[in-house]
Amino acid sequence: MRLIDSTAKISPLAVVEEGAQIGAHVEIGPFSVIGKNVKIGAKTIIHSHVVINGHTEIGEQNQIFQFASIGEINQDLKYQGEPTKVIIGNRNRIRESVTIHRGTVQGGGVTRIGNDNLFMINTHIAHDCSIGNRCIIANNGTLAGHVTLDDFVIVGGMSAIHQFVVIGSHVMLGGGSMVSQDVPPYVMAQGNHAQPFGVNLEGLKRRGFDKPAMHAIRNAYKLIYRSGKTIEEAIPEIEQFAVNEPAVQLFLDFFKRSTRGIIR
């Protein structure tokens, strides 16, 4: 049984399999294919030639453009057809030829995407990735399996991020970056392999950070990258900054999660 809201607009040239759940005011263009285990939230627009399959849940007010593929079998050779998922939030823009693969049992079973993200043309998001809110991945950006992007991350075009890497909030990665280690929050980085080039001050200004917060973040950055100290040696001083400026706490929380070491 197909569960399609009466207000949905579905092209007669689209294929919606039995069992799919289509919310109110959803639009589905011609030659798109929606699998039987897919759930699509209200006011999401799916343009022509989109394929969404697997156990995929898509929230409200998303826009998905031509030739995007969401929920397809992942490229992990260990995958044996388990009912793993893709879960996507609200108001995301998924542009042409984007691929988002379902998770693996070993990686938690879910590829998860938050709200208000923009994935430009040819972005690839592999199995078990976790993407926060308000991130931008520019054309041809590639995320390997198990990558985490926190909130407000910008990934420049033609960049690639290695498996299990964590990218902290408010990071700006320049185009063509190859990232094989974790990138702390607030950092600008670029290169092959990616290296830090300072604090993303322009991004912080746009998001309403005040001068005391940015000053404290810069001081923490200097301790990490310019003092000659190890992370373990720098942490006590960063903790002191965090007492007066909560924004610095992101550094401390990040170091607890980091498993691959940070870029240098």
Curated annotation (Swiss-Prot):
Pfam families: Acetyltransf_11 (PF13720), Hexapep (PF00132). Its main location: cytoplasm. Gene3D superfamilies: Hexapeptide repeat proteins, Udp N-acetylglucosamine O-acyltransferase, C-terminal domain. One of its GO terms (molecular function) is acyl-[acyl-carrier-protein]-UDP-N-acetylglucosamine O-acyltransferase activity. Keywords: Acyltransferase, Cytoplasm, Lipid A biosynthesis, Lipid biosynthesis, Lipid metabolism, Repeat, Transferase. GO terms for cellular component: cytoplasm; membrane. Its EC number is 2.3.1.129. GO terms for biological process: lipid A biosynthetic process. It catalyses: a (3R)-hydroxyacyl-[ACP] + UDP-N-acetyl-alpha-D-glucosamine = a UDP-3-O-[(3R)-3-hydroxyacyl]-N-acetyl-alpha-D-glucosamine + holo-[ACP]. Pathway: Glycolipid biosynthesis; lipid IV(A) biosynthesis; lipid IV(A) from (3R)-3-hydroxytetradecanoyl-[acyl-carrier-protein] and UDP-N-acetyl-alpha-D-glucosamine: step 1/6. It is found in: Cytoplasm. It comes from the Bacteria. Belongs to the transferase hexapeptide repeat family. LpxA subfamily. Homotrimer. Involved in the biosynthesis of lipid A, a phosphorylated glycolipid that anchors the lipopolysaccharide to the outer membrane of the cell. This is Acyl-[acyl-carrier-protein]--UDP-N-acetylglucosamine O-acyltransferase. It comes from Actinobacillus pleuropneumoniae serotype 7 (strain AP76).
